Amino acid sequence: MASIPATVATVAQANMVAPFTGLKSNAAFPVTKKVNDFSTLPSNGGRVQCMKVWPPLGKKRYETLSYLPNLTEVQLAKEVDYLLRNKWVPCLEFELEHGFVYRENARSPGYYDGRYWTMWKLPMFGCTDSAQVMKELQECKKEYPQAWIRIIGFDNVRQVQCISFIASKPDGF
């Protein structure tokens, strides 16, 4: 039989909690006084002259980067490389009639038609090279030359679409 040392607490040890002494004085905390001096506020006043306003009439906005001129093959490949570096799954979608959101079936605020496009094949799980995506883009263009085609980056961990941009537009758009 092994002997186990016994621990016995005395009454004095059981009541060893420090007494409450009240709240501390505010004088112990440092105080910074704010000065109403507007000379240090940030300003872009010097740059306003060189800014331009996007004309809202007659210009369709599609996706990210849609306000830029059409991207070249090299620029598209760089965007796809960015997508792959972030471990997003590339996916191609196309639309034959409307490459932009529009209202046809409902007039309620916040509802738009044209947000869901047809997927080109399957998402490219395991894709590691932008050349693979560019090859699929060329196939989609060959099959549907008058379609809007966009490239999407899908995060399969968070299950969200992280990037989407137009890769090809029909002639005249």
From Swiss-Prot:
It comes from the Eukaryota. HAMAP family: RuBisCO_S_bact. The keyword Chloroplast applies. Belongs to the RuBisCO small chain family. The lineage of its organism: Eukaryota, Viridiplantae, Streptophyta, Embryophyta, Tracheophyta. It is found in: Plastid, Chloroplast. Keywords: Calvin cycle, Carbon dioxide fixation, Chloroplast, Photorespiration, Photosynthesis, Plastid, Transit peptide. GO terms for cellular component: chloroplast. Pfam families: RbcS, RuBisCO_small. This is Ribulose bisphosphate carboxylase small subunit, chloroplastic 5.
